[in-house]
């Protein structure tokens, strides 16, 4: 069961790594013409991660892993890590999918505006995005 959890975690990590690379590309190198496509692609993969991290299958894998015989043979740090994954899973499931999708898109679009604001030395253009990100982050942590 622990191996199944490791494989599931690896899939999540691979998609998160892809998101990070795409986000870096968006901030550093992406031509203006491709920026909206990259924002949509990053949001798509963010939602894939969200769905993996909130799925019933993932929850069952976590519960089964903790109840397995293998779990009792793990190092203490590994046990804490898996229990922490379960705690995050239970918290993350409370976040509505539509909210998370909007939150993801907002952060990715804000990256575009931030890039332009830095280039033009006009940080007022980023202000509304920053306010919205702060507002949405506060909402996110109420779930």
Can you say where each PLM-predicted feature lies in the sequence?
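A well-structured
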Residues: 1-143
């Amino acid at each position: 069961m622990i191996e199944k959890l490791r494989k599931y975690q690896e899939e999540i990590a691979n998609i998160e790594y892809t998101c990070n690379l795409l986000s870096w590309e968006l901030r550093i190198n992406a031509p203006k013409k491709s920026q909206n496509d990259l924002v949509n692609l990053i949001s798509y993969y963010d939602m894939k991660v969200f769905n993996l991290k909130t799925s019933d299958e993932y929850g069952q894998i976590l519960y089964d892993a903790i109840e397995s015989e293998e779990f009792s043979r793990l190092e203490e740090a590994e046990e804490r890590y898996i229990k922490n994954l379960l705690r995050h899973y239970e918290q993350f499931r409370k976040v509505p999918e539509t909210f998370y999708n909007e939150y993801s898109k907002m952060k990715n679009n804000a990256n575009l505006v931030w890039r332009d604001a830095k280039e033009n030395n006009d940080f007022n253009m980023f202000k509304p995005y920053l306010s919205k990100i702060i507002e949405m982050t506060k909402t996110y942590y109420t779930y």
